[in-house]
Amino acid sequence: MSIINNILSKIVGSRNDRLIKVLYKTVNQITELESNMQALSDEQLKSKTQEFKDRLNKKETLNSILIEAFAVIREASIRVLDLRHHDVQLIGGIVLNNGNIAEMGTGEGKTLVATLPAYLNALNGKGVHIVTVNDYLAFRDAQWMGKVFNFLSMSVGIITSNMSYENKQVAYLCDIVYATNNELGFDYLRDNMAFTSEQKVQRMLNFAIVDEVDSILIDEARTPLIISGPTDDYAQIYQAINHMIPHFTKQIESGAGKEIVIEVAGDYTVDEKHKQVFLTDNGHGKAERLLIDAGALLEGVSLYDASNILLMQHINSALRAHILFQKNVDYIIQNDEVVIVDEFTGRTMLGRRWSEGLHQAIEAKERVSIKKENQTLASITFQNYFRLYRTLSGMTGTADTEAVEFQDIYGLETVVVPPNKPSTRVDKSDLIYLTTQEKFKAIALEVANCQKTGQPVLVGTSSIENSELISTLLEKNNIKHEVLNAKQHEREAIIIANAGSIGAVTIATNMAGRGTDIVLGGKLLEQATNKQKIDWQNRHDDVIKAGGLHIVGTERNESRRVDNQLRGRSARQGDVGSTRFYLSLEDNLMRIFASEKMSSTMQKLGMKKGESIEHKMVNRAIENAQRKVEGMNYDARKHLLEYDDVANDQRKVIYQLRDDLMSVNDVQDRFISIREKVIKQLFSDYISAELMEEDWNVEGFYNALKSDYSVDLPLQQWLNKGVDIDELQSRIIQGMSTICDYKEETVGTKPMREFEKAVMLKTIDHYWKEHLATMDYLRQSVNLRGYAQKNPMQEYKRESFAMFTSLLDTINIEIVKSLSNVTINENTDILDVEQQNNDDAQATHSNPNEQTKQASITNNIQTQTDQQNTYQRKEKKVGRNEPCPCGSGKKYKKCHG
């Protein structure tokens, strides 16, 4: 079939080729308007924005004005920035406008491309979000491109992590908003924890343009954004278990699958492919003995007992911390804190914390202060957040390898946009060595040779540790260089700006500096003099003669896309450049995923120490290994989405419930409806009409009403007098209503309505939080059902639905209980109920990677507590010997006094 497809592609072109051909027709129409736009004065060009808005109000569509709008933004860009959109940039803009992904190479001007669909889609007044990966890029792009938008009377907002919510409200109302993916997600969660509509910052999620879309929608797809609060302090347990870990030994095994042979029995096994650690039977026995010795486990009590689940989690976290997570690779120690290093960018992730006790276990391992764990209050994945937008689009230099996932998960087609100038980059064959030491020596020699000829070199590493090893090696060889990793992130912009200078050598961890072009000859100052421009041009020409930027990859990444990102740093906009990867059989990818026969095969080919080979068989093995990992990661992301979709459906119901409450000032009718449902349920539980009278539990019903709802009514007397079920129900409702009416008379109608709303929202939030924790436990345990020949996913759906139904019932019951039992205090203002906040609540960004790396970003926010406030009395109180206003006939002191 693939042969037939190849033949057809050669005859009629690929789908991508045909699509680009069609889009060029639209580009030509835009270009035809260029002379008309040039003839307009600045004021006439600016007035086009209002003209377009008027036409949209007259029922024209955005697509009908696309050609004119793109011509306007192109001309405005020339006048304001002296930058003209190339034809391929117009194609990229059309692709984004159509809600697809535009793959455009490094240096093709994606930042400028985004102005096209952003301007067009902001004309309807619903707003456009341009999403970046960090605050620096959001601020830079907003300042830069904002000049064009402002020229055309469009407002531009910037959302960063350190803004107040008042400033965010203003920013979100702008026509075009630049923001990071993290802040957008957190603001969405915070909005859905607000107590009033006025406290929300976001408006409708209309149109999103995601820059570096592969990084956000693929690399961080399994990254739940979490609002959390602190739980119990287990610092002593973490420290005790940390002291136990050195006593455990690794089990040595050989073979694979069913043919595993235990060569040396041990306490744990390591699954490097899935980044997991498992205790063996010996390990469980040893763990129990050590815990008993430490006083953490009682003699004769099994570690498998339900009450010891937390101990098992702590042990597992400690093992992972010691065995799978390395200092200066996965994290660094900074100011007595464990700071996570982003595996995709090499940047530090200040404030983020791994969850499930992993971060605390690493803190214990490194002997720094152990902070409390957090409990989830609200969460959402990037997958489900970005699917909330009416239209989603994205751009990146590397999307084609993940095109299937973009289509399957997000419904986004990937369109490869041709470069403005053909690429002249030379991708040299990989060089493979037997050991890492030999590989590093070869890299040092390559770098030295390039520096002698004046060719700038960018050395890409996968970790801080490797970047510093190579740096040490270069220092020994007297090779001047710069290191760009998490420890030098403050100097990132300066280092990247000079990375293309003559003879420059830059070591960068993974894709640190991504989003900033490396300019050959170094960066030219914006206000450069003529002499400075001439000097820069000479330097630029010298670098071109030396061969342009040379990329040295120190190992293959697990994803081909990440390798392509590194390659894409070279030969921008048709410049010359070259790339080469240096590998060894000790590299993680080769060691874990490549064939076990690789080493012996290479030795059969005659390899000796210090020698390298270039062989198609090895390259195929590497590519197959990468495909394996990509497939595993895709399956993991898809698996997560299946589970999160269940939670997402429930999340939508809860958030809609909150929105409905916040959208009205008077919730009394809603409360009355809830109260009647609860009373009917009580009747069903105690004295149902479907039961025989002798089976009724009148005493239990009486006690429930009295203790839970503060209603003391003579139920048995009424029943003895022949009062039927319907009349009894009516009297109970009237009794509850009378109590609430009295409270309303005491504090006033408006404060009472506000209090009712606050209690409803707090109750929803509290039990939603508890539900999320229960869902987490269910998800962690449901996979064990597979051993009982049950489908874990179906079991999860079935049980979570039952739990959610129970949650909705519980929320209704607790709302009625709270409003029935609330007491009146003369010294407290009712409006304070909304202001009671838990200052310990945090915004957390959990980043599960191969089911182990769960990171979190921590920013102090304010969220409502579960404490219940009371009213300030505004009217005369009832005397203790006066009749109770509930209608029971009793004195107030013996009823509700």
Curated annotation (Swiss-Prot):
Identify which cofactors the protein needs according to its UniProt entry.
Answer: Zn(2+)
Keywords, ordered alphabetically: ATP-binding, Cell inner membrane, Cell membrane, Cytoplasm, Membrane, Metal-binding, Nucleotide-binding, Protein transport, Translocase, Translocation, Transport, Zinc
Question: Is Lipid metabolism set as a keyword in this record?
Answer: no
Localization in the cell:
Cell inner membrane; Cytoplasm
EC assignment: the record states 7.4.2.8
Give the binding site residues for Zn(2+). 884, 886, 895-896
Q: What PROSITE patterns would the database entry show?
A: SECA (PS01312), SECA_MOTOR_DEAD (PS51196)
Instruction: Give yes or no: UniProt keyword Transferase.
Output: no
Record's compositionally biased regions (Polar residues): 839-856
**What is the membrane topology here?**
Peripheral membrane protein
Output the Gene Ontology terms for molecular function: ATP binding; metal ion binding; protein-exporting ATPase activity
Instruction: Give an example GO biological process.
Output: protein transport by the Sec complex
Q: Which InterPro entries match?
A: Helicase_ATP-bd (IPR014001), Helicase_C-like (IPR001650), P-loop_NTPase (IPR027417), SEC_C_motif (IPR004027), SecA (IPR000185), SecA_CS (IPR020937), SecA_DEAD (IPR011115), SecA_motor_DEAD (IPR014018)
What main location does UniProt list? membrane
- What PANTHER family does its record include? CHLOROPLAST PROTEIN-TRANSPORTING ATPASE (PTHR30612:SF0), SECA INNER MEMBRANE COMPONENT OF SEC PROTEIN SECRETION SYSTEM (PTHR30612)
UniProt-recorded name of the protein? Protein translocase subunit SecA
Q: What's the source species for this entry? A: Vesicomyosocius okutanii subsp. Calyptogena okutanii (strain HA)
